[in-house]
Amino acid sequence: MEGTSESPILDEFEANSNDYDNEFISRFSQNPLHAFSLFTNGNIQEYFMNNSLEKIIIHIVLIIISLCGIKAQTSKIIYIVRLLFWKMYNVINNLVNKMINREKIADRQIVDNRFREFEERFRILLLQHDENIAKQDNIVQYNKLDNFAESIKSEFNLKVAEMERRFQELKWRCDMIANKTMNTIVLTNTVDSTNKDEKIIFDEGSVVQYNRE
């Protein structure tokens, strides 16, 4: 069983990438127990520092398989372990992608909510602006109507004042005519009364003179 292009992730797990790995494979291929000599020469710290976690796990799995008495080719065992890690990688990657997708969905929902909130605020702002414009238009119309009413009121007051002035003038003329008429009547009555007194009252001298004649 060999690697294919369908599993490119397997190429990242190269077992023969450093001296420690090559030495481990060579000793393990001769005798699995010889691999333990790498850990008895005081190089265990350097071994763990120079090998990745995947390779260390592969080496441990190979040692366990060999100690259990299962004899198989090293390359096939390594490939099987690679497949196992590839499967684990896919599972973990799928889980990570699901979590990322959930976060993206959550972020998208947050963005949608923010956008809807902004849209609602913008709509309310437009309504308020329209209401303000309508109020201003109403105020302008009211001011125009009020000015028109004030002009009519002023004109009416002027007409009333003019009518009152004419009425006062007419009243004054009527009073003048009435006074003249009354004066004429009084004078006439006075003259008539004087004439009547002259006819009724006779002077004694005049009477004596009349008798003589």
UniProtKB/Swiss-Prot annotation:
HAMAP family: ROTA_NSP4. It comes from Rotavirus X (isolate RVX/Human/Bangladesh/NADRV-B219/2002/GXP[X]) (RV ADRV-N). Homotetramer. Interacts with the immature particle in the viroplasm. Interacts with host CAV1, early and late in infection. Interacts with host integrin ITGA1/ITGB1 heterodimer. Interacts with host integrin ITGA2/ITGB1 heterodimer. Interaction with microtubules blocks trafficking to the Golgi apparatus. Plays an essential role in the virus replication cycle by acting as a viroporin. Creates a pore in the host endoplasmic reticulum and as a consequence releases Ca(2+) in the cytoplasm of infected cell. In turn, high levels of cytoplasmic calcium trigger membrane trafficking and transport of viral ER-associated proteins to viroplasms, sites of viral genome replication and immature particle assembly. The secreted form acts as an enterotoxin that causes phospholipase C-dependent elevation of the intracellular calcium concentration in host intestinal mucosa cells. Increased concentration of intracellular calcium disrupts the cytoskeleton and the tight junctions, raising the paracellular permeability. Potentiates chloride ion secretion through a calcium ion-dependent signaling pathway, inducing age-dependent diarrhea. The lineage of its organism: Viruses, Riboviria, Orthornavirae, Duplornaviricota, Resentoviricetes. Glycans are attached at N50. This is Non-structural glycoprotein 4. Belongs to the rotavirus NSP4 family. Residues 75-213 are cytoplasmic. Its main location: host cell. GO terms for cellular component: extracellular region; host caveola; host cell rough endoplasmic reticulum membrane; membrane. GO terms for molecular function: channel activity; toxin activity. Keywords: Activation of host autophagy by virus, Enterotoxin, Glycoprotein, Host endoplasmic reticulum, Host membrane, Host-virus interaction, Ion channel, Ion transport, Membrane, Secreted, Signal-anchor, Toxin, Transmembrane, Transmembrane helix, Transport, Viral ion channel, Virulence. GO terms for biological process: monoatomic ion transmembrane transport; symbiont-mediated activation of host autophagy; viral process. It is found in: Host rough endoplasmic reticulum membrane; Host membrane, Host caveola; Secreted. The chain crosses the membrane at residues 52-74. The N-glycosyl content is primarily Man(9)GlcNAc, with a small amount of Man(8)GlcNAc. The keyword NADP does not apply. It is a single-pass type III membrane protein. Coiled coil: none annotated. InterPro entries: Rotavirus_NSP4. Residues 1-51 are lumenal.
